[in-house]
Amino acid sequence: MAKALQGVMAALLTPFDHQQQLDSESLRRLVRFNIGQGIDGLYVGGSTGEAFVQSLAEREQVLEIVAEEAKGKITLIAHVGTVSTAESQQLASAAKRYGFDAVSAVTPFYYPFSFEEHCDHYRAIIDSADGLPMVVYNIPALSGVKLTLDQINTLVTLPGVSALKQTSGDLFQMEQIRRAHPDLVLYNGYDEIFASGLLAGADGGIGSTYNIMGWRYQGIVQALREGDVAKAQRLQTECNKVIDLLIKTGVFRGLKTVLHYMDVVSVPLCRKPFAPVDEKYLPALKALAQQLMEEKA
């Protein structure tokens, strides 16, 4: 299973319609688009998927739709993290029922939980996942939970934990984790340092911008396998030019707008309180969509 979890995993967006409801047809198209661009798997229901502005029922519905489109074709990881252990367990059970390959959970946030409470939270989710491997999700910039290296080392050795999504930007820590846990599946979480993360020991990555240019990230992986660091850096630079624009527009709404211009997503809106993309960026996003479609073809 560890080998199946390695690779380039798109952190899947969740399309909504003009009434702010789940757009299931756009979601299906997006899943098929990602499969078509050659990614290894999907990370469903995470930060990029706007999970924390959805109800549990909606999150389960997303898992069900994605499984219908992609089960058995690519690796599927269900992010089931919430502040509530019971709700995370419910989502983990759903992931097992729908045939996902693994579950993942961000550290419980908002309240100042003790580290042992974090460990108990993960143990409970692992139990409810009924044999599915756990991917611990470390994203201190958004969760507010700043784990020490010793705490990370403890979490990744809990029974049932197979992988870590490391979204911290600390490449030294990435290398330290790899050195301490050679068999752990380690994901780079920040797209803008993907190549550097691989060189620091990551097995692959989970990222938002893979939704629109996953083939570029696969190209980085292949270049490094062939020892062509210069090519990997050139591809990373091309990815980062896109990321520069998306940071200005707002990453999730910018991605949805590009996918709208690619005829994948019908409505390029995130769920409120996220605002729409500022109209001044629309020409640049449309040009980007055209460039990527030509490159992919």
UniProtKB/Swiss-Prot annotation:
Keyword Lyase among UniProt keywords: yes
Location of this chain's protein in the cell: Cytoplasm
CDD domains membership: NAL (cd00954)
UniProt cross-references to InterPro entries, sorted A to Z: Aldolase_TIM (IPR013785), DapA-like (IPR002220), NanA (IPR005264), Schiff_base-form_aldolases_AS (IPR020625), Schiff_base-form_aldolases_CS (IPR020624)
Catalyzed reactions: aceneuramate = aldehydo-N-acetyl-D-mannosamine + pyruvate
Molecular function as annotated in GO: N-acetylneuraminate lyase activity
EC nos: 4.1.3.3
Active site: Y137, K165
Sequence positions that bind aceneuramate: S47, T48, T167, G189, D191, E192, S208
Function: Catalyzes the reversible aldol cleavage of N-acetylneuraminic acid (sialic acid; Neu5Ac) to form pyruvate and N-acetylmannosamine (ManNAc) via a Schiff base intermediate.
Assembly description: Homotetramer.
HAMAP family in the cross-refs: N_acetylneuram_lyase
Family stated for the protein in its record: Belongs to the DapA family. NanA subfamily.
NCBIfam families tied to this protein: nanA (TIGR00683), PRK04147.1 (NF003164)
Protein name, UniProt field: N-acetylneuraminate lyase
Lineage: Bacteria, Pseudomonadati, Pseudomonadota, Gammaproteobacteria, Enterobacterales
Gene: nanA
